[in-house]
Amino acid sequence: VKANPAASEEALLRRLYLDIIGRIPSDDEADRFFASRDPDKVADLIDELLVSDGYRLHQFTWMGDMLRHKSEGARRGDFALYDRWLKDQLKMNRPWNEVVYEMLTAKGSLATSGPAGYLMRDPGMPLDNLANTLTIFLGANVSCAQCHDHPLAQWTQQEFYEMAAFFGSSEVSARDPRKISKNLATNALSKQDLIKVVAQNMASITELGAQELVYPEDYAYDHAKPGDPVVPMLLSWGGDDFKRAAYQVDTENPTELRHSFASWMTHPENPRFATTIANRLWKKNFGIAVQEPVEDMDDPRLASNPALLAFLGQIVVAAKFDLREYQRVLYNTKTYQAEVSVTPPIGDIDDFAFPGPVLRRMTAEQAWDSIQTLIAGTKIDSYETDYSHYVTKFAFPFDDFTDEEIYNTALAMKASGYLTKKERQRGLDLRASALQQPERPDHFLRMFGQSSRELIDDGSLEGNIPQTLVLMNGQIQEMVSARDAKLIRKAKSLDSMDEQVEFLYLSFFSRKPTEKESDRIKQAMEEGTSVPDLAWVLFNTPEFLFVQ
């Protein structure tokens, strides 16, 4: 297969900004790059973007789709502390294996422990959470094995329960705050007040001291009977796996089971952990994974290039699970910096040889953040929202308190003003990472494919008619072409028509107009087309929404 030629300077600049920090470059950023004669300017730009605020904010939205992160969960659970914790890990560039280990071994409540938010995503559903965990971090297609031996994969129901037993000595609480709130409510303290105080404390992870998981009532295999206790056992993809250092963990001490599971999963010698995140990040940046789908990597021989997949996993391990460093390697490859290819038909994806990245539409978050750049400028990268203090202020040892102590604590919190309603910012100066996760169904982000966060990797790049109508007639296009938008103000400040046209093309497409485009646009402007109208036209072109 012949490699694609190198991408143009303009296409590569825009691609790097969208893939690394999740938005298009401003005209000033593009001008600065094009003006440089430094032969290392591409590598220098990659380094600059990878340490920027934009990188971690964009990485957060990508990670949120994968982890099914929500701002609010069941039983009035508020995940603001988890949200803050995730963003802090990205800010510190903490190694991926350490982040995952802490999420899997967390204890405490939503009010006291940020990483506890991961397991609390599925309260009272340990089997579902395990299936999601194995899929997200190991690419293991195990969900069917919850109920029976998997008909299309190698996993059995016995193996699934043996893995679930590592969580059998922990309780991820799904307690309903409404019952206790109803019992304690008075004229001085309403049921809603009490729910607000106790909900974050009732959502918690605790240790039971013993492994309590048993086989289900409908278990139908000869290995065990329904109701028999399950003995923890680690998954294996091959006969030699158990010789690996990753498997040398304690599977008997009930107080160490989750830690043993997390140690095994995140170990450099786990057969799938490094290659799974390597494959996911390759897809993020190239448009197609080396092995599709990313949720099913049980047999790496089915990858389009098994040797490449194994090598990428080795890079992640060599980088000590530094995802920023791993992506730096990807961005500096000739393959990434080549011209894009058209996405192959579904039946040909398994044989795609990656002559370059594939042409793809922006994600909903990339589109939103790029639009905010046009409206407000690059200052959006420095704006963040942090609601964790709304949650931590409710922390108290709920399980150790009597009903009277709970009531008095809630009454004191109300008197101190703690029960003031949390107002979530929705301004157009905010990036997608600073908004509610996910946004409401009628929001631009959801209409353009933002994940519902109900399923893993549920975001969509599919186009539809409502999207077209939003771009043509919605509030967003009005904001882009409004007189107080940064884009319009700067365009109108320029002296000549040539400068205005060049500025708008640079702002929307990170390139100058061709001679033909310039002539046609100037003719339209001479005939009465205004700068805002021209911005509307460019905003509605397919070129704006695609990553080339």
Task: Show where each model-derived region lies.
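Conserved AdoMet
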Residues: H58-T61
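Short, solvent-exposed alpha-helical surface patches in non-cytosolic proteins
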Residues: A11-I20, Q467
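Primarily short, surface-exposed interaction patches in extracytoplasmic proteins
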Residues: K2-R14, I24-G54, R68-Y407, E454-G459, ...
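Extended glycan-interaction surfaces of carbohydrate-active proteins
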Residues: Q475
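Active-site segment of extracytoplasmic enzymes that catalyze sulfate/phosphate-ester chemistry
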Residues: M63-L67
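Long, His/Glu/Asp-enriched segments that create or flank divalent metal/ion-associated functional microenvironments
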Residues: Q372-P438, H443-M472
